[in-house]
Amino acid sequence: IANPHALTLTHIMPDHLSIHAAREDDMAEITGVLLSSFGHMPVEQAMGNVDTPEGRKAMRERHLQAWREHAKETDVPCGIKCVHTDPTSGKETIVGFSEWFIYANPPMPEHHEQANALISGTWVPEEGGQREKVQAALKPTIDTRRKWLHGRKCAVLMYVCVDPAWRRQGAATMCVQWGVRKCNELGIMAFLEATEEGQHVYKKCGFVEVEKVRCDWEGEVGVFPAMICWPRGTREEDRTPAILSS
């Protein structure tokens, strides 16, 4: 969803990289970057995020639908792309991508009790218990978000990915920093679950670990730290879950 106002937030950095709001017609290119980072994960594969023509098409449509739903709540862009502009030819290539779901208006208390469309798994076939299996694997993620975000203004960083040829050159940091700056402007918290590869980027951008999310897939447990970047001025006593354990 392109937001003309968001383009004024473009940040230029060395090596001809810049940040822009992603457009719907960017999604075909972005899908390739997403698959290069997450396509190896069994749960992503089980959800149909696979590198086939049919898988790519379905994946694009799911993300675009999530963008459209998000656009009903805010004019802040959801998809953020990092673009390399060739200094000789002027050709632009999407080398990185992040997906920020920003909820700057006070949500209903139950807002985060339902899964974001991209992790609901409702499209997974029911045959053989596949949907139930996927949703069970994702439940710890959904429960942790509910615990920390219930009723709060916040932003959820769903995906950060970089083309393999462009990793460790600042693209991921730029994508994350864009959202952190926006959250600071709005005075809201930013939340994510980190992969092992991404943790150092998030820490550098101000995120701190609040707990570990453990997801089980066919007996193999993956651990993904839940991390929060609190807005400036947040009191220590307020840096607690929205829903406290009884």
Model-derived features with residue positions:
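A short helix-loop-beta-strand connector motif used in the catalytic cores of GNAT acetyltransferases and
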Residues: A58-T85, N105-M108, G129-K133, H150-V156
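Conserved acetyl-CoA-binding loop-helix of GNAT-fold acetyltransferases
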Residues: V162, R168-R181, K204
